[in-house]
Amino acid sequence: MYRDFIIFALGILTSFMLIIIFGEIHDRYGNTPSNREKRKYIEDRIKEVHDALKIAFAEMKYTSRDSITDNYCEYAKLQLEWLNSEDVMCHGNVEDVMRLRRDCLDLFASNKNRSLRSVVLEDIDDITWETNRLSSTYDYKIKFYTKAYKIYISWLNSNDLLCESTSERELYKAKLEKAILHLQSIR
């Protein structure tokens, strides 16, 4: 009788422990969004940021107050940091991400009275420098930057405003192609 009670008590304790353990596992891993939900969130946020940047361009065109333009530039800087996040690189559409990146860079250029050309070329320099330090453990970054570099090359080919001369265009295209080869060799 006493042994049956101990077995019964151990069975109840084991049941409670399993319920608690499975509850913790579900809380930790069960509430993470799926890849589809992450993609949807990123698409929605990109649309919201595009809308905010349109408003920023319109306001900057009609006002010269430094506080407003500085706030919009700070906002664009935060969005550029978000565009470099792991979730965006893994689940975001590269074309949409790069279009938003270009809009943010355009906002910086107009705020700092610099040409879009100098800001984009500076961004290319920064990104190629960053990817030269990548290792094979960052597979999502390698895939993202490979596609992003191809988009940068198409920008250079399609927009005469980004480069002052053909030699400068070819120099940056060669730099990007070298970076693509470097990323492919890491894989």
Model regions and ranges:
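Repeat-associated, polar segments at repeat-unit boundaries in modular proteins
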Residues: 79-121, 159-187
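Charged, low-complexity interaction regions
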Residues: 57-70, 87-95, 133-143, 160-169
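Feature marks short, highly hydrophobic, charge-poor N-terminal signal-anchor/signal peptide-like helices
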Residues: 1-10
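Transmembrane-cytosolic junction motif
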Residues: 21-40
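Short amphipathic alpha-helical heptad-repeat segments
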Residues: 41-52, 68-79, 93, 116-124, ...
